[in-house]
A protein has these predicted regions:
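Pyridoxal 5′-phosphate
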Residues: 1-383
């Protein structure tokens, strides 16, 4: 893959290496949103079928990205909404604890903590190893060591949101299946930019906000719920998710049944005429790019930066345990953090500080000068 910067509207003097914060919209996604506004401006253009047809197409496209059937996909407004549906349907009559990671994204932690509090369960927080060598492998081992027949659920992200650490999701998923625990995963920081197969990993629920690596707008997202959830209780009772919703002439013939699969977990008003076309266009482009090609592009792009970091005593996770589109590095004592952040800002190099980690998150809109600008700024801050 070559640079796709021409599909975006980023100025040349902006070095935006911060897709994990929020992705820029492609021009085509902007256009879809503008067309959606025009459609909403003239509702006579909307038929009853329009409330459902594009939503089904979006589910189909997302299902292909994560290797899941479309009828097990739901449209959600946020990752926290999708997580709540997943966590609230964990069977509460077995087990005595749930597991999360230390320094996990707040919504993931809060959702798990609230469920544990409500159901009188312990929340086990798995800390990272204190040593940096072999850290990712040892962290996965710590998770596995805490899992047993009394584990209700393991709730974690596909990669750690602060530094891109990869966990062995396959081993964790297999052990969850073995001990009959739910495996609930937040894919917001990797799905769309890194390949994933929910069946192979034995994931029970996967939630993704769209505004990061799915390249979509804010306030919409997608979730996968396995068949274990098909009789669960949704966050809300939207008429659009009921079995007779497509026939507008019969809506007051109230029914108990939902549409099949995971449809009950759709947010109300999921057929947003502005956001949904934008997300549809973004998913189409991701499918054309392919997540594995995005990883390869980012891996080649960041190689000069990784070489510089390695040569100058910066710590970062070793290649096979770290994502290429999102990774973090620790500063050596020779670098003044506050001075560095100030110079990054003045040079229009956009990265994030998460804890003690400088997080770099490139994508296909980035080019070599973006990486070079970061390297030059780091060089200028060595004492």
């Amino acid at each position: 893959m070559t640079s796709q910067k021409h599909l975006f509207d980023l100025p040349d003097d902006i070095h935006y290496l911060n897709g994990a914060y929020m992705s820029p919209l492609m021009k085509s996604v902007q256009d879809a949103g503008i067309q959606g506004i025009k459609t909403k401006s003239n509702p006579s253009l909307l038929s009853s079928e329009d409330f459902f047809t594009l939503a089904e197409e979006v589910k189909r496209k997302f299902g292909k990205i994560i290797q899941a059937p479309a009828n097990q996909i739901a449209i959600i407004p946020s990752a926290s909404y999708g997580l709540k549906a997943a966590v609230d349907n964990i069977p509460s009559n077995t087990g005595d604890h749930a597991i999360v990671l230390a320094n996990e994204f707040p919504s993931d932690y809060y959702t798990a903590a609230e469920w544990c509090k409500k159901n009188n369960k312990e929340l086990k927080v798995i800390e990272p190893p204190s040593v940096l060598s072999g850290r990712a492998l040892a962290w996965t081992d710590r998770i596995l060591a805490q899992m047993n027949v009394n584990t209700c659920a393991v709730i974690l992200s596909t990669i750690h949101w602060t530094d891109g650490t990869k966990f062995n999701l396959k081993m964790i998923g297999e052990k969850c299946r073995e001990i009959n625990a739910r495996f609930i995963v937040d894919g917001t920081q990797s799905v769309g930019a890194m390949p994933i197969d929910v069946g192979e990993l034995k994931i029970d629920a996967l939630v993704c906000a769209a505004y990061k690596w799915l390249m979509g707008p804010y306030s919409i997202g997608l979730a996968y719920y396995s068949e274990e959830y098909n009789a669960g209780v949704p966050v809300e009772d939207s008429w659009m998710n009921k079995a007779n919703a497509n026939d507008f002439t019969k809506l007051t013939r109230y029914v108990d049944d939902y549409k099949p699969g995971a449809a009950r977990y759709n947010v109300g008003e999921f057929s947003n005429p502005i956001l949904l076309p934008m997300l549809d266009r973004a998913l189409q482009q991701i499918a054309e790019w392919r997540a594995d090609a995005i990883q390869d592009y980012c891996g080649n792009l960041i190689r000069p930066l990784l070489n510089y970091l390695q040569e100058n005593a910066y710590w970062f996770e070793e290649d096979k345990y770290r994502a290429n589109h999102l990774f973090g590095f620790l500063l050596p004592p020779s670098v003044d953090k506050e001075k560095l952040l100030h110079q990054l800002q003045s040079r229009k190099v956009f990265v994030s500080l998460r804890g003690d980690v400088i997080r770099v998150s490139p994508h296909v809109y980035n080019v070599a000068p973006d990486i070079e600008a970061l390297i030059v700024t780091l060089k200028n801050n060595c004492q």
